[in-house]
């Protein structure tokens, strides 16, 4: 009796099994989330329906900034080659959105042709009309960097009302559409002329739901002296603090991202370190792409649930016959109270609600009589997806991540800093002396020997206790000194001879100069007397 109840329970408890994360996301979206979105007209308010290409596409990087901040030059620097449609200059040059993607041959696909290609994730952009599509192209070219990621170049954000209106399409809305679908948003600022216009501020605010994807690049930093750079950096952080309302500080990378000589080379080491950090962040995108798509689907599901509660509440409050227009105005004006009631009744976080002002503007143009009442079954299916199916997919995400190499983006600028003497940190810190014929520690060994013979060596060795008295003078923490001891005690006898003691002091010097210690002792640091022992 009532066997259907048991079947429904079993279905809820046993999540679906998927072969890949991409396949799982597609099936969950189409079977569980899309029906809720369509029932409550989610796509008219927030975001168009997702398609297969949205789940299958490569990670995308969106570049945003005012004109002449170096967005197009940054892409050229990454690729180490020109791309079709590229224009660079001090004036506003890029007047189109350019999707730079991998292709067998160099060429440009115009926007109207691009939005009908089911293999590209841009089909829903046709909603922005011809004014936008005439300013949207895809630049295809064969490049090893583009085998792993795609890059979206955007028009420079201009100051002034005329420039904003004359675009003919909603620039902020287009950027928001891209922001939902990309893996990384890079905001570029020019260190030489730092200025955040009102239009740029509005764009950054429009991207506020995607702070986790945002990174900031302070470009052209080689054009100013160190003292000025500190002031510019401080001014940028202060300005961003007023625009981006998050307690966390957005990561800012300082550098000069082009292939020309540095104008003021004082901060070369800083620029190199910052460039490596940014490259590592971009290189992590393919590895984390599945997790990002899963995260975006969860975010979308939470918004769709809240949207369903809002629409059904408005439907419930509407009279069936008379006074509909007045009631509609009253409900729109009192939307904040409806938000508060839904928040209390359903224990929903305030951060899950859509922007109040924007929602009120959108509701003005809607016919409330066409809204649907609350359908619990649709919400239960989405809750079940979030509670069970997503957990199952998380396991699959970890499996896929573990099978991928750590650095997947290859070629272009990423290749030049990996190998040889121009690799980051080559010949510095523990790598100093890597190409020398002589043991690098031998330079300072006479000084270390003087200390060694004051520590009462027995049979040419000092005890761990005596070595510790000397090593703690460096004021390094015990955890660091313990690692140095482990690296220096090559024969593992718990004592140090003069070569091992000199090596320990060399490693202390490396650490005090701000470099990281290696996990294993490099071959060039092995004392000549110990090289046969190590073999």
Curated annotation (Swiss-Prot):
Residue numbers of N-acetylmethionine PTMs: 1
Coiled-coil ranges per UniProt: 198-227
Gene3D superfamilies: 1.10.268.20, EF-hand, P-loop containing nucleotide triphosphate hydrolases
Presence of keyword Hydrolase: no
Pfam family, one: EHD_N
Notes on the domains: The EH domain interacts with Asn-Pro-Phe (NPF) motifs of target proteins.
Protein name per Swiss-Prot or TrEMBL: EH domain-containing protein 3
Provenance organism: Homo sapiens (Human)
